[in-house]
């Protein structure tokens, strides 16, 4: 399985025209504690272990939208992003209105992503409406979590200005939730 992943990555780089140059490839992940960061580090470790001839340099980013922007500006050679944000970047809609990004190729779907709202076990928050007046992390700016949080709040009819919005990465959000400094956080 490990060799298969490395082979797929190697073929991907070859077929998409990604220039390896000195053998280092920057991959945009997301915040520490999230699945993108974990996946990118695992992949980087496999590439090193399997002696692929190149090394992946994992870059901590805000997440999906940031990765697409960094990919478009050639700061990174690979990036992990949610499918809905890839479509928005390509079409120039949503957070990418007026900033169409089309100089990338989608390589693979890694896994389906569900957006979750995390609260403490002793919380009285049971519905989205219960977030009103609460301190809630919607994720880092330019993250898929932030986009999903905004979509969920809009679709539920709860204006974002009725919650006390914070922009925290997953690790900080979990720590602040455990300490009682925020009431909930969105996790995609």
Where do the language-model regions lie?
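Ligand-binding pocket segment of bilobal, Venus flytrap-like solute-binding proteins
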Residues: 68, 76-80, 162-164, 168-188
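Structural recognition of the beta-strand scaffold that forms the well-ordered cores
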Residues: 57, 79-81, 116-118, 137-139, ...
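Bilobed "Venus flytrap"/periplasmic-binding protein-like clamshell domains
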Residues: 23-50, 54, 113-179
């Amino acid at each position: 399985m490990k060799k298969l992943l490395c082979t797929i990555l190697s073929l991907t780089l070859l077929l998409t025209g990604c220039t390896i140059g000195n053998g280092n490839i920057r991959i945009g992940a997301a915040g520490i504690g999230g699945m993108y960061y974990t996946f990118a580090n695992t992949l980087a470790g496999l590439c090193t272990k399997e002696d692929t001839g190149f090394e992946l340099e994992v870059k901590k980013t805000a997440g999906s939208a940031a990765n697409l922007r960094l990919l478009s500006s050639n700061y990174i050679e690979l990036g992990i992003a949610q499918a809905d944000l890839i479509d928005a970047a390509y079409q120039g809609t949503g957070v990418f209105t007026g900033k169409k990004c089309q100089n990338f190729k989608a390589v693979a779907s890694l896994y389906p992503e569900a957006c979750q709202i995390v609260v403490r076990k002793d919380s009285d928050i049971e519905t989205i409406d219960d977030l009103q007046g609460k301190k809630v992390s919607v994720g880092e700016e330019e993250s898929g979590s932030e986009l999903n949080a905004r979509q969920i709040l809009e679709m539920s009819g709860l204006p974002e200005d009725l919650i006390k919005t914070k922009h925290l990465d997953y690790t900080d959000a979990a720590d602040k939730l455990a300490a009682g400094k925020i009431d909930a956080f969105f996790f995609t």
